[in-house]
Amino acid sequence: EWLTDYGNLRSNGYIPVGSTGHTAGAPGNPFFQNFVMCQNGLDAALAGTDLEVGLYIPGLADWAGMISVGGYAYGNSRYDWSAGPQAGEDIVPWFGGVYTRLDMTFIQNWDFSLQANNDSYFDWTGFARLTYRMGGSRRRNVPDQVEQPMMRNEHIVRAHQTPIVALNHDNGNQPWRVIHVNNTATPVGNGTAEAPFTNIVAANAAATNPYDIVVVAQGNSRVNLDPASSAYGDISNPYGGTFTPLAANQYFIGQGAAFFIPTSTCGPIDIGGLAGPRPVLSNPTGASINLAGGLVTSNFDIVNSAIGIGSAGNLSAPGPGGRPSVATDIDIYRTDPAARTQGIVINNASGEAIFRDVNIGKQVTLPDGTVENWTMTDGSIVVNGGAPVIDFADGTILNTQENILEVANTLGGEVILTANPGQPFLETGDGVLVSNAAGDVTVKNAVPGSPSMIIDSQQDGIRVVNSSGTQTFDDVVIVAAGGPGFAGVNLQNNPGTSNFNNLDITTVNSIGFLAANDN
């Protein structure tokens, strides 16, 4: 500090010691521990320096008036963000700013200061300060100034941001609870964002509360699912096991595409939209996902599973108006020729399940130019028993073996398949089978007049047997049936009602439309 009777030149250095930074979460990353964050938290002491020059103003001499101008540079490079798009960067990058201050003494012992700062980190800040000093406070001469304390930028040498946790309005405004899975995590953790579980089974066991969210990272589950890979389709590190919700209204979400949850704190938050393809699930002995209790699941590839998506009891959450189970943005397919697979299997269920943007089977071109159908071996959609309501729309089905749709032994409910315009369900297996069904079945296109299903069947195109429900097939094209003894449409012993609108049948060596003992 250099003092004169006309003004001064002053510089400060800021050297914090000890623990100088604490964070809760990270910018651009919604997760911290088991919480979803609306805003990450930060407390950081800043190192740096400032420099100012001050001059007494002649017109304010009676009040010892001084105008000071200065600049500063601060930052905290001791700690880095550990996650999110700024991972590896300083928690407070170095920044510079400028300021100006007016100092005056109105009456003996009372000092007044007014300061304004501007910088790229805090934007505009400042303070107004009134100070009572024992023993007088006139400051025009050097001896008086020596007795005055140094002026410092205390108000901006600590960076602070209060963490805000996302709350769930539907769960009494309790914080959302998230359990994390990443099969590349080392060591094996306890399910926090910083220490994930490495497998689905452990995460499933930990998700015991209503509205719990299990979030699955891609990890290394997509090995050999790059179309350019010479071993394309030979998956080696998928997530195994079955996820079955242990409480109502849970979530099972893969990362790689946007998925928003509602919060009462800060509106919708995306918990799935980190960059990269979706994680891969595979269970050769059972279902990869069981729908129950209003489960919401999204953003997965299910490959070579005995059952892609299954069920476990009531599909809806308990109570009147309980939330249905919902599956969105899921691809189910088979890459292993030896695997026995089914797409969606709903057994003896009640309640409702909604499927949106779920694709079953697909056609791929291998690196050598070979075209393969990665489809199910034992049918695409099977509904057996119970009285569920199944609503499938905005997805695609490519079926080459067994039935594209089988509904059997239902006691009520309804199965609705709605195709998108220009994306009819494609069947070259064993057609549609409805047997002993008291529930209704509807196949249609979202835009009437566009084909909903194109059937090139090895057996009957559509077979309905011993069923008392109402079956409605709109805009179905049957280009072939299985030959002698088979029919494009075969109705046998049905006390219910079968409706066909805009049905187009072309067959060779088989019957077009056959009805026997039918209502």
Residue ranges and their predicted role:
Residues 178, 211-213, 220, 242-243, ...:
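Detector for repetitive beta-architecture
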Residues 17-68, 74-84, 88-90, 105-113, ...:
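Flexible, glycine-rich linker and terminal segments associated
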Residues 38, 79-86, 186-188, 223-241, ...:
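Surface-exposed intrinsically disordered loops and tails
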Residues 225-227, 263-264, 285-289, 304-311, ...:
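Short glycine/acidic-rich loop motifs that flank beta-strands on beta-rich extracellular proteins
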Residues 217, 253-255, 292, 303, ...:
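Feature marks extracellular polysaccharide-active and adherence modules
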Residues 163-206, 210, 218-222:
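Right-handed parallel beta-helix/beta-solenoid
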Residues 211-265, 284-285, 305:
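N-terminal extracellular ligand-recognition/capping segment immediately after the signal peptide
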Residues 251-305, 336, 424-425, 445, ...:
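Right-handed parallel beta-helix/beta-spiral solenoid domain characteristic of secreted/periplasmic
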